[in-house]
Amino acid sequence: MTNIRKNHPLLKIINNSFIDLPTPPNISSLWNFGSLLGACLTIQIITGLFLAMHYTADTTTAFSSVTHICRDVNYGWAIRYIHANGASMFFLCLFAHVGRGLYYGSFTLLETWNVGIILLFSVMATAFMGYVLPWGQMSFWGATVITNLLSAFPYVGTDLVEWIWGGFSVGKATLTRFFALHFILPFIISALVMIHLLFLHETGSNNPLGTSSNSDKIPFHPYYTTKDFLGLLLLMLLLMTLTFFYPDLLGDPDNYTPANPLNTPPHIKPEWYFLFAYAILRSIPNKLGGVMALILSILILAIIPLLQPNKQQTMMFRPLSQFLFWILVADLLTLTWIGGQPVEDPFINIGQMASILYFSLMIFIMPMTCLIENKMLKW
């Protein structure tokens, strides 16, 4: 009698996706981030569910309810900080996952890549709305500033902002709808993850060499389940160290002050994982231009497959492209640092130069380098 996992209608799907899945034998630890993102999403949904049981989405009681969770609910402080720092881990894995896709040319798997970009936007939207919920100073003013950016769109801008706010300013209606959306979006993200995996398993995984693995594959279990488990242990070590030793390291002290519409904080800034995009937004003096640059800073990933004329899929054997890739990483770290600094010299100039370099690398320099490398290899 054959194994039930290979015949049962439901178990068969799980088996073909996670157990008997034919996998390239040479994928490195950088391919772990997909499963780590799945783990992060699971942690966020579970901790979020428990937080939602005690949270009240009302402007008068939201801040108090978060305080109540931390002080009075059994292990509420742990659940709250695992959720908050879990978001940071989520984005850490996301950036590494996208970076690996760029480095090893995974963007050639178009459907998987495009669903991934939709996922990235969805996770960013979810994280932004989650940051508003504690209703501290930075929550309130962050929501006001970021939603107000939509008013830059001609003709419909103001109506669009008031429609999102549910009034003429950020208030009870805004908080309620943000909570509703923050609750439902992770489940939509889970569905998108399944579509992401469906498209990936249509073509099979890429590998560091960028060559076809069809002639030589190994089952996912036990090889990569073990490897992923090691990655998960390291992720949990980092998350638990953050949560139990430095819970507020990545947060903003202003968020421990209840929201006050009459008092603006000296420096309004989002969480660290949005700072690179925030720096690009601030580097352009024009409001609409800044908003367009902000959106394009992520949306540019969608046109990467069109801009890459390289004959070799990965950067593994292309030293010039590797050098530019690490310059891009350094540039993004610079933008992240600038996003957290006040708007004054020399930070304004550094931010503008880093923004120009970011778009130049993506649109001109890296594709041109690919052409040079093709020429050097006589391809």
Swiss-Prot record:
Membrane topology of the entry: Multi-pass membrane protein
Cofactor dependence: heme b
Record GO cellular component, one term: respiratory chain complex III
UniProt main location, coarse: mitochondrion
Alphabetical list of InterPro entries matching this protein: Cyt_b/b6_C, Cyt_b/b6_C_sf, Cyt_b/b6_N, Cytb/b6-like_sf, Cytochrome_b, Cytochrome_b_C_euk/bac, Cytochrome_b_N_euk/bac, Di-haem_cyt_TM
GO molecular function, one term: ubiquinol-cytochrome-c reductase activity
Cofactor note: Binds 2 heme b groups non-covalently.
Alphabetical list of Gene3D superfamilies matching this protein: Cytochrome Bc1 Complex, Chain C (1.20.810.10)
Keywords: Electron transport, Heme, Iron, Membrane, Metal-binding, Mitochondrion, Mitochondrion inner membrane, Respiratory chain, Transmembrane, Transmembrane helix, Transport, Ubiquinone
Pfam families: Cytochrom_B_C, Cytochrome_B
Self-association and partners: The cytochrome bc1 complex contains 11 subunits: 3 respiratory subunits (MT-CYB, CYC1 and UQCRFS1), 2 core proteins (UQCRC1 and UQCRC2) and 6 low-molecular weight proteins (UQCRH/QCR6, UQCRB/QCR7, UQCRQ/QCR8, UQCR10/QCR9, UQCR11/QCR10 and a cleavage product of UQCRFS1). This cytochrome bc1 complex then forms a dimer.
Protein's job: Component of the ubiquinol-cytochrome c reductase complex (complex III or cytochrome b-c1 complex) that is part of the mitochondrial respiratory chain. The b-c1 complex mediates electron transfer from ubiquinol to cytochrome c. Contributes to the generation of a proton gradient across the mitochondrial membrane that is then used for ATP synthesis.
Name of the protein this chain belongs to: Cytochrome b
